[in-house]
């Protein structure tokens, strides 16, 4: 919360544009967040910062210890800083910056007669191009570490684990609150329900079950990924001394490999993507079930055979995978996008609203932008249902177009990395031009202007509602 002390009437210690409440330490508004992932917990901290009462319900029994790495760009960090100093402090404690001022894009497929498994040149391979990353300004970290830091910053009792949402009621035409029912038979109530429950959001499923059933569940993109977090020494052995310390993308036909350092350059996050023509069959072996699991057992030998013709450094990375790596199906909502992110007193954020493939590496960052926009809107609202609805609609108005663009562009970017995007193919010049334009849309975003637009739209809706009832 903040405003510059150089401005007339500024509050000491608060930056320009901060949302400052004048009606006490806490509002009468209560918010229930379903889903305790990165976006849900960041939103909770942002609401607490604005004096809003919040409860988070997470289906997992405890904090997951999945060693998945991911990265945040500069726009996401600006959103964190404005959400709450506690969010920014959390990421600063666990993240590391890219060592060099550019990202590297490599031909991971084409071998040459000079290639030798043990040579430095072989591990380096053919550089297609470098792109300056000062604008993207990546910070990388382990998901579990960042989440744990944010959880510790929340007031005790804010998060309840082991709570899986079964259903909810939003009696908008009455004065009753939104009521949540959990699978263990317990209930809860709040003025607002926010679904931050990810790809297979239970809140999304109920919100659109009758009106738009086709959007209730995401669709398989025919890409599967395999993840590994490996020691830096192993990565240096596989790729040489330089590559592991920077964002690297190895491109090629029907597959691509992303790697970048995490944990203060002690570890390297490796993500291998492979395109498959066949439908997704999950670990149950049943492709007909309506909501398949997103993971299934993998086989390193199958992957090694699939990439046997790729360059040595890529094969070396694949060798670092466990013998039975988990295969993660890549699902998104590109085929059936949700028509809106809020109705009544129920809203969706992050993957629950706009599940995207990970090829831009921006899904979590866009979710944090969502969290800021929603925290600003709800931080201005009262417990009155018209005020809540106005806040949620202001959030929807500001966030919908940008986040829907991400879904489409990320899917296309996955094809660009695999040399099959129409009109681009494997041409490095065209690949670079495509990526530069898309990345500019991601980083060239004014989060302060976004927050101000949320305020303006909220106030306009409240004024319109008030006028209509006079």
Swiss-Prot record:
Active site: 227, 260
Pathway entry: Mycotoxin biosynthesis
TM regions (residue ranges): 28-48
Phosphoprotein recorded as keyword: no
Annotated EC: 1.-.-.-
UniProt-listed InterPro entries: FAD-bd, FAD/NAD-bd_sf, FAD_monoxygenase
Chief localization: membrane
Name the UniProt record assigns to this protein: FAD-dependent monooxygenase SAT7
Organism: Stachybotrys chartarum (strain CBS 109288 / IBT 7711)
């Amino acid at each position: 919360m903040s405003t510059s002390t150089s401005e007339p009437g500024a509050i000491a210690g608060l930056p320009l544009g901060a949302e400052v409440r004048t009606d006490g330490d806490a509002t009468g508004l209560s918010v229930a967040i379903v889903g305790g992932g990165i976006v849900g917990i960041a939103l909770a901290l942002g609401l607490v910062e604005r004096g809003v009462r919040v409860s988070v319900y997470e289906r997992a029994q405890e904090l997951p210890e999945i060693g998945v790495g991911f990265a945040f760009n500069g726009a996401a960090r600006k959103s964190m800083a404005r959400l709450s100093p506690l969010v920014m402090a959390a990421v600063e404690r666990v993240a590391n910056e890219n060592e060099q001022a550019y990202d590297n894009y490599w031909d991971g497929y084409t071998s040459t007669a000079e290639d030798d498994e043990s040579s430095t040149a072989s591990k380096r391979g053919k550089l297609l191009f470098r792109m300056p990353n000062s604008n993207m300004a990546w910070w990388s970290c382990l998901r579990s570490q960042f989440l744990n830091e944010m959880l510790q910053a929340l007031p005790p009792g804010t998060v309840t684990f082991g709570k899986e949402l079964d259903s909810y009621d939003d009696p908008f035409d009455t004065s009753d609150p939104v009521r949540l029912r959990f699978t263990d038979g317990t209930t809860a109530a709040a003025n607002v329900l926010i679904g931050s429950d990810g790809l297979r959001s239970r809140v999304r499923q109920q919100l659109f079950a009758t009106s738009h059933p086709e959007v209730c569940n995401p669709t398989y993109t025919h890409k599967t990924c395999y993840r590994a977090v490996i020691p830096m020494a192993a990565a240096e052995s596989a790729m040489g001394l330089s590559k592991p310390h920077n964002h690297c993308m190895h491109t090629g036909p029907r597959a691509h490999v992303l790697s970048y350092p995490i944990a203060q350059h002690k570890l390297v996050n490796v993500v291998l993507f492979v395109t498959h023509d066949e439908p997704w069959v999950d670990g149950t072996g049943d492709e007909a079930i309506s909501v398949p699991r997103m993971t299934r057992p993998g086989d390193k030998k199958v992957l090694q055979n699939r990439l046997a013709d790729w360059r040595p450094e890529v094969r070396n990375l694949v060798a670092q995978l466990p013998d039975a790596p988990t295969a993660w199906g890549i699902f998104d909502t590109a085929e059936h996008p949700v028509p809106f992110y809020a109705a009544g007193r129920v809203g969706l954020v992050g993957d629950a609203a706009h599940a995207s493939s990970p090829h831009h590496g921006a899904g979590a960052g866009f979710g944090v932008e969502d969290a800021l926009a929603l925290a600003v809107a709800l931080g201005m609202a009262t417990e009155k249902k018209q005020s809540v609805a106005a806040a949620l609609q202001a959030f929807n108005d500001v966030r919908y177009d940008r986040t829907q663009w991400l879904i489409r562009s990320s899917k296309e970017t996955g094809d660009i990395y695999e040399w099959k995007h129409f009109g681009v193919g494997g041409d490095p010049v065209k690949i670079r031009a495509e990526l530069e334009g898309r990345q500019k849309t991601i980083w060239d975003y004014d989060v302060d202007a976004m927050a101000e637009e949320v305020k303006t739209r909220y106030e306009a809706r409240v004024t319109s509602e008030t006028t209509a009832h006079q």
